[in-house]
Amino acid sequence: MSTRRLPALLLPLALLAGCQNNQTLKEIGNAPAMSPIGSGLQFSQTPQMGMYPKQPKHMASGYSLWSDSQGALFKDLRALNIGDILTVNIQINDKADFDNETERNRTNASGLNWKAKAQILGWTPDADSSIKYGSDTDTQAKGKTKRSEKLTLLVAAVVTGILENGNLIISGSQEVRVNHEIRILNVGGIVRPQDVDAQNIISYERIAEARISYGGRGRLTEVQQPPVGQQVVDLFSPL
């Protein structure tokens, strides 16, 4: 590679490293901007969602006061339509401890013997050969994983879609800015209207396809992350 092309190849990498963490020029010296209201409402229906069977419609007969939005006679109205709001109770307290150990031994030995004898014009040559070969492998592996996670909070979510079978698609976000750091919480998934309690609250373990994200952005996050240029070098470095 020509030495003249090297600066041209390094220039885009340098520009990329200077724009790490999507920091804009407006945020230099200022607190990071918060997202507009409503930007956290995400709804992207996959083809698999359209395969659910349609929910049969329950028509009130006579003077019936039954309503599917309640699901019980003595409960308050719960979120059922697009745009309704419900509260998600997140209480994650997970612990995992794995200790795996593997040992593998293998020994293989083989041999080959052959003998040849012939008579040519009164001369009898004799050939004898022996070949032996073998292999021996030994593999030992040990792995251990230990982690503990705890997250407790309440967040409001909005019904952004309704599946054919009546299940609700919810999406919600919450942003809290303290000084120059923003903490961002995103939650989304599919819930059954029957799982929403009388207080219009649903627990996180009853959310199917749950996507819960708790992170942040700001000055502290930028310092903790390595530069983009270093990440690219670490990704493609053979050593």
From Swiss-Prot:
InterPro entries: Flag_Lring. Residues 1-18 form the signal peptide. Its main location: membrane. It is found in: Cell outer membrane; Bacterial flagellum basal body. A lipid is attached at residue 19 (S-diacylglycerol cysteine). GO terms for cellular component: bacterial-type flagellum basal body; bacterial-type flagellum basal body, distal rod, L ring; cell outer membrane. Keywords: Bacterial flagellum, Cell outer membrane, Lipoprotein, Membrane, Palmitate, Signal. A lipid is attached at residue 19 (N-palmitoyl cysteine). PROSITE patterns: PROKAR_LIPOPROTEIN (PS51257). Assembles around the rod to form the L-ring and probably protects the motor/basal body from shearing forces during rotation. This is Flagellar L-ring protein. It comes from Agrobacterium fabrum (strain C58 / ATCC 33970).
